[in-house]
């Protein structure tokens, strides 16, 4: 499965966590101390609402458990791992001058420095866990950053983990019938990723 994901495959894993663990993680995320920020965080704006406004917090409590579940699923050892909780307030998205509609910023995810000389940074594997049932929410995947219509669209379903290469262009999808969008993103590197 790792080769499939690293070759731009997208895999879905329904009921990834046992219900009790899923509810505990959801409760943890709702009680985190989030930092008001924006994406892309490397750019400078007059204020955060001029970009893609969001709230973020690193999540640590269940990382050993999540990492172990992923290793069992993928049949490989994870060598680097981080989990990031992200909350999006849809009223803030509405006032952003970026004129977001259904899709947020089309982007690629976190990269890591390769150990091979003269080889460009490579994408980590990304995982997205949803905490709401939103047919119009979820994640859209694109062939390139300039596209306005996604090639693949995956709706948000609670406790469904979506795994993909961080090198695929993608964007969050917004369901404006909700006030907030809460997700847990995992970024990791496995053995053999040099």
Regions flagged by a language model, labelled:
Residues 86-194:
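Catalytic core of non-heme Fe(II) oxygenases with the double-stranded beta-helix
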Residues 1-95, 99-103:
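Non-heme Fe(II)/2-oxoglutarate
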